[in-house]
Structure formats: C-alpha cells, structure tokens
C-alpha cells in the first residue's frame, strides 16, 4: 500500500501537464506522479527571483508551516524538494477550483444561507485546527478556498501564514487581500488570531450577498472603508445571518465572536441543524449540480512590508506521505526536525491526524487568550520596529466608549468626538493669503486610542473651517501609526486629545443615583462626582479641584469643617462609595453586546417636587416651573499644558440679596412668540430668555445679575453652560447669532396673562449680554 502512495523526490518522477496559474516568482502546473499515478499540483518557485526580491524567508516559512498540516479542510502538501533552479511543492489538486470562480462562473448567484452555512462550518473547522497550533493564516478569502472533487472546502495558500509562539502573540505586518483585511491590520496595529475571524466575516458576507462588504473601485478607498468599518447590511438576509456577520465584523478584535462561538451560533444551528462537520461526499451537493468539472489555479497579490509579493496556489484529494529534506538554505532541518524519522510529525509515522480543534472545544476558553492586556509587540521579521525605541507614552490609551458626540474650539485647535467614537483634532493657523484661519494639520484617533492617523490636508493651503471634521482620509500608509510606535514628535497631539477626552468624561454621567437628600452623579472618570441636594445646596468632587461645597444660595462654603459643610460632605462620601459599588457590580454583569451604562438608580422623592415639575415624556416648556441656576460649575481653561476650572467666590456673594429676592418668586414665562423656521422664544420673569429650536435643542440667555452667559441644551438633554472669556462651539455660535433679532421681536410681544401679577422691579432690563463659555454638564 505504501508503494502506491509514494510521491517522487525529483521533478523527473512526475508527468508535468498544463499550466494552472502563473505569478511573479512561481508557476503552478497540473501533474501526475509516475509512482502513484495520482494527479497533483506542482508549485515551481524560481530561486533566482525569490533571492532577488528577498522572499527566501517567506518561502521557507510557507513550506515550514504547510508541511506540518493535515486536516480535511486544509489543502495538503504531500512533499517538497528542489534542484538548482527551483523549489517544488507537490500539493493536493482541487479539481473544482477556487470558490470565488465557482460562484462567479458556475453558480451565477450568491449562495443561499443553507449553502453558506455549510461552507462556513468547514472553513471554521479548518481555522480552529490552525489556531489550535497557533498558526495565523492572514489571507482567508474566497480565492484561497478551493473545492475538491467531492465539493469539500480546502483552505489553501499559506504564503502569508505565520507561526505564533503563543495564542495571544501580536504581529505588525500589513498583508492580505484588501477586501478581507481587518482594520487592525490596515492600521498597522498589533494583531493576532482575531484577524482571521474578521476575514471569515467578510467571507460569509460575500457568500450571501455576492460581493465583499467593503468593496470599492480602488484599493485605497477600500482600505479607508475597512478602517471605518462601515458597510451596508442587505435587508433580505435573515436575522441570524445579519447578527453573525455583525459579530464577526466588530471593529475591535476584542469584541469579535470567537470561532468556537460561531459553531454554536443560531445561524449554523438553524441552517445546518447543529450537526458536526461532515466528511461524506457531496457535503455541498445542494449547489453542486450546476458544476462543470474543471481544474483551476489563480494568482493573487499581497503586500508585505511594502513589497509586492505575487502568490499563487494550486488547485485535490489524497493522503499524506513522508516529508523529504530540503536544502538548509530554504528549510533548516535544525529548526524543523526533519533530518531523521523520529523527529518528523507524528502523523507521518503513524498516518494519524494531529488533534483537531473539534476534540478540544469543551476545554477551550470562549475568549481570546490574553486579549484583555495587549502585550507590546516584540521584534521579529514580521514586525515593524518602533521609531521611538524604548520610549513610550506615559499615559494609557484614551477611550471614548459611551461619550456623546461633541465639538469644542480653542484658539489653536478644534476638537471633536464623532458618533463612531473617533477623536478628531483639527489644528488651525491663520493664512494671510486667505485672510482666515485654515485647518493645516489633522489628527484622527480611534475610539480605543490605539490607531492614530496624522496628515496635512491640502499642504500649503489647508482647508476652510467647517461645522464638522473633514471626511476620513489616509493619504499614505506613512500617515498611520499605532499607540506603540507613535513618534515622539506627535506625542503632544496625543496628550492634547487625551486631555480633551478626559474633560468630556469628567462631565459625562455614568451613574445617576437619587438619594434621600439629593441627586448624585458619578462621571465616566470614576473620580469626578457631584451631588445636587434637593435643598439647593451642591457638592462637587474632582480629581483636580478636590471637594467644593455650595450652600442653598449658591455661595461657596470656604470652611469645610463647619457643621453645614460637614453634613453635606459626609452624605456625599457615602453616596460616592455607593455609586462606585454600583458601577463595579454592573461592570461584572454587562456583556460585550449589552452595556449597562449610563444608568439611573431611584428617583427624586415626590414630597420634594413641585407640582409643576412632575412631568413625563418630552420637555414641555409650558408645563413646568422654570428655574434659573443659582450657581454654575467653573469655567474651563483648556490648553495642552493644563485643564483647570476656576470660579470666583465673589460671583456668588455679589448681588446675594437680589438673588434671594428672585429665588423667592416663581420663574414663570411672561412673554412667548413663535418664529417660523426657528422655534419658540420665551422670556421668563427672572430675565432669562429661552429659545426652543425645532431641532429639539434649546438656548437660554441668562442675565448678568443671575451669573451671565448662556446655557445650551442639546436635543438629547445634555446641557452645557458657557460663561466669560471662552469660545463657543459652532453649533452654539450659529444659534447665538440669531438672538439679537429674536430679542427685538420679543420686545414687541405682549405680556402673557399669568405674568401681569409679577412685580415689575424683579424683571431684569432687556439688555443684550455678551455670550461666553462655561461647561456644566
């Protein structure tokens, strides 16, 4: 039996037939072994070409990895040898060619969900086998999936595969097929086994839809779409299919579904009935009827360390045989242990398979090993050395999870957090030629803080300032960095962005808790905390300013040791600990798919609410009592070197009698007009002018005696107060520009009926106050 399965060790022992495919440094031929009379595919690699292009190590690695593998879903490498001119790989012949060509030329339609599930199960089984041996394929695509004579799926082309030392090892090389490459690979971030999971998601989408999810006419535009991870999901796909694709194509590799979980997903259980991988002939017979038997080969391209590597693989069906030696130049036996029989893989001696992942599923962790803490990449031939050597940023990567979109302008930069969580810094310089400020540098940072893109838009001229950041652009791969290798000349930009994110976090509630005495809010920083007592007092705790206590009149209590302050601080400390415990408990309860934050616990006691303040649903400015804030959080002085909050005590102490008089009277509407295409303008008895815009946002202009400035409330209910000497965001500035004409119209409006009993001396003169900038979320 052994003699009938023996493969030749020289090219003369094969009858070489027609060409299947040709690449830059190799050709693939159909051939027949003269000993076993079996059809095979022979890949002939030109030694001179690979030596000239520096790809000798890549060929060595391909042979080293592929020769060890034996699995029903992996194309088998039978043997390899060489002569003076060529390295020869004798491969299993896939009679029915590549899956991509079969779908386009024979099936002439996308696969059904049942067919797609059958293919998916076989691919996942093969990848689990590879991953169980810490082998990352890095180029899973329909062109690299071949069909045997019995229509079984065969994973082929290990030209980009790499052997990891451990499952959580990370590499940095940018390689793969553009339509199937993962965001972390495009961004040159450290990546590992989850990169293959992303490719499986692209594969499944392509099978069911007929085209890749991020396909465009150009490679650069395709890679840009991959980085943004934005694709259209066809509505005709079932819920199970859509759910699985979304889980496979999660932008963050930590959030992607694992291959083990794919096998348990309802999409496979529903369409394949949860049965195990089938090795019986005709596993894909439901779509094989239209197949005309053909031999196939293909040539593909891959970018590896900026070099174009022409790769191809053969296109069937046999069992393995002994692995002969190859010249040390290409396959060092000291590393692989092929110099003697006892050092060869066990399946070569006994004809048995290496343990398949299916045998190990019950003992495998459902999560990717080691992905909670990404290890810094180490130096090897696949990794890009860090330009900064041993120096690293001293701050951890920023993170914008759960932060609302916002845009903030300083003197030299415009900072934004987008709906996707991406942070965008637009650095501004005055251009004399255009007589205006122009955007000269752009820094885009991913939501997890690990991918950074820095470039100059339209160098020399810059871009005009808009209400939103410029569209995403990657001018060249040299503009893309990751957290580990960011050059130190760009560190200040990263620090600037991180402090901006920290500022927004310090104003974004994570836990809202109603205690017996007040409304408590623990911010996303987990250190910033505030309590607004029902009595009107307030306690603020921040990592920069410590604890500040305000009494019911809005005045700062300078002596925190007095009885009044002590009681407020004690209650605040108790509530702070309670909120932290709630947060920790919910962190354990939440999953990748379902977050628990932000969360509101309890509600304000009914006895402490005025009748006019009890309302449900949307904000209705006519149905509750208006109140002017008696105190405001400090104004923000934002710079790259410091973020500080300041507030003068005199702001609270001056006009205190006046404030007390105003506080004694209900703040009710006295005038109201409706302005077409703008909204409803209301004047309150305390002098506040409010504009409720039709888009759901609201601007309140507060008179100087009340503290001055404006309060801007977004459509989602998030309020920001702007005070003295600060710039306004564009959205607020546009609305403020309309205020003078609205106030003029309001002056001509008659008083409302319920306003005639209000004492006239309590109404603030209608003067246009300057509009300044202070955040008080």
Curated annotation (Swiss-Prot):
Its EC number is 2.7.11.21. Residues 371-390 are annotated as: Disordered. ATP binds at residues 20-28, 43. Pfam families: Pkinase, Plk4_PB1, Plk4_PB2. One of its GO terms (biological process) is male meiotic nuclear division. PROSITE patterns: CPB1 (PS51984), CPB2 (PS51985), POLO_BOX (PS50078), PROTEIN_KINASE_ATP (PS00107), PROTEIN_KINASE_DOM (PS50011). Its main location: cytoplasm. It comes from the Eukaryota. Belongs to the protein kinase superfamily. Ser/Thr protein kinase family. CDC5/Polo subfamily. Homodimer. This is Serine/threonine-protein kinase PLK4. The lineage of its organism: Eukaryota, Metazoa, Ecdysozoa, Arthropoda, Hexapoda.
């Amino acid at each position: 039996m052994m003699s009938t399965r023996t493969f030749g060790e020289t090219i003369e022992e094969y009858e070489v037939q027609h060409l299947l495919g040709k690449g830059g440094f190799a050709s693939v031929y159909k051939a027949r072994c003269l000993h076993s009379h079996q059809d095979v595919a022979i890949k002939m690699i030109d030694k001179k070409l690979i030596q000239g292009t520096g790809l000798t190590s890549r060929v060595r690695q391909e042979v080293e990895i592929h020769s060890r593998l034996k699995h029903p879903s992996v194309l088998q490498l039978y043997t390899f040898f060489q002569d003076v001119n060529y390295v020869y790989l004798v491969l299993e012949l896939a009679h029915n060619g590549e899956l991509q060509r079969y779908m386009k030329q024979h099936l002439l339609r996308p696969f059904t969900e049942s067919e797609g599930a059958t293919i998916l199960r076989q691919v996942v089984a093969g990848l689990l086998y590879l991953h169980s041996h810490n082998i990352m394929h890095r180029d899973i695509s329909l062109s690299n999936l071949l069909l045997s004579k019995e229509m079984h799926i065969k994973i082929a082309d290990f030209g980009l595969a790499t052997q990891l030392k451990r499952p959580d090892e990370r590499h940095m090389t940018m390689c793969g097929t553009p339509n199937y490459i993962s965001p972390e690979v495009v961004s040159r971030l450290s990546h590992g086994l989850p990169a293959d999971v992303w490719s499986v998601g692209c594969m499944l989408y392509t099978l069911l839809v007929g085209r890749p999810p991020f396909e465009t006419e150009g490679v650069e535009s395709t890679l840009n779409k991959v980085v943004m991870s934005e694709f259209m999901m066809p509505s005709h796909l079932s819920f199970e299919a859509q759910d699985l694709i979304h889980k496979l194509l999660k932008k963050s590799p930590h959030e992607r579904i694992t291959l083990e979980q794919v096998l348990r997903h309802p999409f496979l259980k529903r369409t394949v009935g949860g049965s195990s991988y089938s090795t019986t002939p005709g596993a894909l017979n439901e779509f094989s009827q239209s197949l005309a038997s053909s031999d196939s080969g293909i040539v593909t391209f891959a970018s590896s360390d900026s070099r174009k590597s022409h790769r191809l693989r053969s296109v069937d069906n046999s069992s393995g045989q002994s692995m002969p030696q190859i010249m040390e130049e290409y396959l060092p036996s000291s590393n692989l242990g092929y110099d003697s029989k006892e050092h060869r893989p066990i399946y070569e001696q006994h004809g048995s398979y290496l343990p398949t992942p299916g045998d190990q599923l019950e003992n495998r962790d459902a999560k990717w090993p080691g992905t909670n803490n990404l290890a810094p990449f180490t130096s090897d031939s696949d990794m890009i050395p860090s330009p900064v050597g041993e120096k690293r940023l001293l701050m951890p990567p920023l993170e914008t999870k759960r932060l609302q979109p916002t845009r903030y302008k300083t003197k030299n930069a415009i900072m934004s957090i987008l709906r996707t969580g991406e942070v965008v810094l637009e650095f501004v310089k005055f251009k004399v030629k255009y007589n205006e400020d122009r955007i000269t540098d752009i820094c885009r940072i991913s939501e997890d803080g690990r991918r950074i893109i820095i470039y100059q838009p339209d160098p020399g001229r810059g871009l005009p300032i808009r209400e939103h950041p410029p569209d995403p652009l990657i001018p060249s791969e040299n503009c893309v960095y990751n957290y580990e290798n960011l050059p130190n000349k760009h560190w200040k930009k990263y620090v600037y962005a991180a402090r901006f994110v920290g500022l927004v976090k310090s104003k974004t509630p994570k836990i809202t808790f109603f205690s017996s005495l007040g409304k408590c809010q623990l911010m996303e920083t987990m250190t910033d905390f505030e309590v607004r007592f029902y009595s009107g007092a307030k306690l603020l705790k921040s990592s920069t300013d410590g604890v500040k206590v305000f009494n019911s009149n809005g005045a700062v209590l300078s002596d925190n040791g007095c009885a009044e302050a002590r009681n407020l601080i004690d209650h605040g400390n108790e509530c702070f600990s309670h909120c932290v415990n709630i947060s920790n408990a919910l962190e354990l309860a939440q999953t990748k798919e379902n977050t628990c934050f932000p969360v509101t616990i309890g509600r304000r006691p009914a006895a402490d609410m005025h009748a006019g303040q009890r309302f449900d649903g949307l904000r209705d400015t006519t149905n509750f009592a208006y109140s002017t804030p008696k105190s405001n959080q400090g104004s923000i002085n934002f710079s790259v070197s410091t973020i500080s909050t300041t507030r003068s005590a005199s702001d609270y102490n001056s006009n205190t009698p006046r404030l007390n008089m105003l506080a004694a009277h209900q703040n009710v509407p006295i005038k109201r007009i409706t302005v077409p295409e703008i909204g409803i303008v209301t004047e309150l008895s305390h002098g506040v002018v409010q504009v409720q815009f039709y888009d759901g946002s609201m601007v309140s202009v507060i008179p100087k005696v009340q503290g001055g400035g404006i309060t801007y409330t977004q459509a989602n209910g998030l309020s920001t107060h702007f005070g003295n000497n600060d710039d306004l965001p564009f959205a607020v500035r546009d609305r403020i520009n309309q205020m003078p004409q609205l106030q003029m119209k309001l002056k001509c409006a008659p008083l409302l009926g319920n306003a005639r009993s209000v004492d006239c001396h309590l109404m603030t003169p209608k003067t246009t106050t300057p509009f300044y900038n202070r955040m008080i979320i």
